[in-house]
Amino acid sequence: MYKITLSLLAFALCFLAQGQDTPWKSKFEQLGEGLPTPNEYRTGSGAPGPKYWQQQADYDIAVELNDENQTLKGTETITYHNNSPETLTYLWVQLDQNMRAQDSNTPLVANSAITDSIPVKLVANSLGAMDFDGGFKIQSVTSNNQPLNYTINQTMMRIDLDKPMAPGDQFSFSIAWWYNINDRMQIGGRSGYEYFPKDGNYVYTIAQFYPRMAVYDDYEGWQNKQFLGRGEFTLPFGDFKVKITVPSDHIVASTGTLLNPAQALTKEQLERFEQAKSSFDKPVIIVTEKEAVKKEKNKASDKVTWEYMADNVRDFAFASSRKFIWDAQAVKIGDNTPLAMSYYPKEGNPLWERESTKAVKKTLETYSKYTIDYPYPVAISVHAASIGMEYPMICFNFGRPNEDGSYSDNTKYRMIGVVVHEVGHNFFPMIINSDERQWTWMDEGLNTFVQYRTQVEQYENFPARRGTPETIVPYMKGDKQFIRPIMTNSEQIMQFGNNAYAKPATAMTILRETVMGPELFDMAF
């Protein structure tokens, strides 16, 4: 009996020891079982297979910004190309503005933090008690002037096709809509407006403003997860033609190439714009502060339409204001000469005139060195208080001096840091098109790593916040209950910045500087 008891005890101890060792096994196991099986679409090397495909969505959009009541109305025709080998009977369209609809579920599931200083409306919004209705008002969904059947489910809309789309088919349909633009300073948001009470004007940063096609791929079919505010998006690539109607004294910054500068700009502005295309040593001021201040006082009543085109991009965004100062500079990137440009109200000066376009230029140069040559015609930094947000060729960035124009080193370096980071997003995810709604680190972590390289290579003694081992120590020493693996859905990540930005960036810094060495790492990266 004693021997049996001793044997059982020994077995139990071995079992417990084995159980204690279990959490460590996955850290060192080979990745074969965790990686998808190679197929004709995606090879074992990670390269596209011989039958790789991706869908395409082309847009013809016309929108009008109402500066009197802060609304945006628009129409679009989407031409969807089914390049898949599968027949489609319905399409999914993203309606991101519906996160601000009055029946939105977003406030019920979003994580929020209440600090000592926060607008009352932002608290109300986080509690689902906001009376603002910022959702899309869909007026029609048609094809060949005939209505289509559609179902709206919060931030997603399913369109049922009258006739299935066979492989190789394309289908065009039109949507008309409008929505109330949100006050970013009161209720937050990735886009919206900021009101300046001293002069009675607005700066509009407009994004996710049109119904956008969802991704359909061989990996998971339709990517139709709801937009809850944190996890951003993945989108099919396509060609855009966009007309933006605004008050005639507004200056527009936008994704793409401006097609009608002679109609949108004054003669003097057009001349300066042309000069900027060959100015490699310093920015050219296209709209001066004096000109912008004059327009603040004398608001135009007529309108003008700015026309743009953008090829092979996944999204489109713009900014508009009569308050904008505008400068631009040419950058030599391989065989390309993109324009680095900045748009900012007088409240951003003198910091923005000194630093923004210079930071855009340095970012394009360094990211192109580590990845691929920047392929787009422009890269734009727009001044927008309290946010940092990116879209193809354009981003919205914080960093405002004091009212007297003074600013601290902290304000300066944080402003430069956010410009580098958001301009860098043109590479991750705008070109590689990773799915941040699913895996945030593949966007933010990769971008933060190259942001760190840009800061240390282009600026002397730059106080980088993320990317070095010493800056990640407090997080890694913290309560393990609040540390998540980087392969965590974006809506479930705790300590979002440390987990999705800093941890992957630091790991790659260690891999580059200590494990592999810069030469091998840079060749592989």
PLM segments and residue spans:
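Hydrophobic helix-coil surface modules that form long, contiguous segments used
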Residues: 211-222, 228-420, 449
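Ligand-binding face of N-terminal immunoglobulin V-set domains in extracellular IgSF glycoproteins
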Residues: 72-99, 104, 115-119
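A surface-exposed beta-strand-loop module
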Residues: 71, 81, 87-88, 118-196, ...
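Short, hydrophobic/aromatic-enriched beta-strand segments in well-ordered soluble domains
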Residues: 76-78, 82, 95-97, 169-183, ...
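Bacterial Sec-dependent N-terminal signal peptides
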Residues: 1-23
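Glycine/proline-rich low-complexity spacer/linker segments in large multi-domain proteins
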Residues: 103-118, 179-240, 260-261, 329-331
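Hydrophobic alpha-helical and helix-loop surface patches within well-folded domains
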Residues: 24-42, 57, 308, 341-525
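N-terminal, polar/Ser/Thr-rich
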Residues: 19-73, 207
